[in-house]
Amino acid sequence: MSDDFVSAGHDPLIPRRDFLTLVAGALGAVGVASALWPFIDSLEPAADTLAAGAPVDVDLSPVKPGQQITVVWRGHPIWVLRRTDDELKTLQSQADLSLLRDPGSANFQQPKYAQNWHRSIKPEWSVLVGICTHLGCVPNFEPPGGSQQMGPGWPGGYFCPCHGSKYDLAGRVFSGVPAPYNLPVPPYTFLSDSKIRIGENPKGETFELADVEQI
């Protein structure tokens, strides 16, 4: 499989620099060294491809509404979420907007083509860099609904267990948390209705992830 799927659902708490190292260490710890290389090989493109920052293509067809997958691009975890109609309505609700520090995405954390209420090219599909803008931990994906950790009435989004930062399902940061910025949106484009390419802008657009306020 050419697409670089890491996981669906909840992502582990891991610093950005240790993202791949921790995966490799965990596999070795349980005595499956023989499976290590095939796993890492499926996790990321070849080393020379990564070094060049080459784009990564992702097949969206297996992703169900409400499901999130994680891929790796330039060593960063990239979240691809298929949002439901109800989740999209929540993103536009005054109740959600009132919780946010930068609801209009005024800070430069995304390309111009994602500077909208859903912070994406197509409302259904969210593509975010899964790194907290506080100290670089990887937040947990917390779907809508009550949970022991998030409590009742949680609208859905992301929670960073490091210091409690929260984001909605568009990656917009809540007010009153340590993280100062919304989650970054990487450059990406649709190759078809069911495939995106991360690391490449739509035709006529220019954007580099390195230019954002905070990764």
Model-derived features: positions:
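Extracytoplasmic/periplasmic/luminal assembly and interaction segments
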Residues: 66-114
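Membrane-cytosol interface motif
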Residues: 52-65
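N-terminal export signals
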Residues: 2-3, 18-41
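N-terminal secretory signal peptides
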Residues: 1-14
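Residue-level detector of beta-strand structural context in well-folded domains
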Residues: 56, 67-69, 186
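Rieske [2Fe-2S] iron-sulfur-binding domain
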Residues: 96-207, 211-215
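Aromatic-capped interface at the extracytoplasmic side
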Residues: 35-55
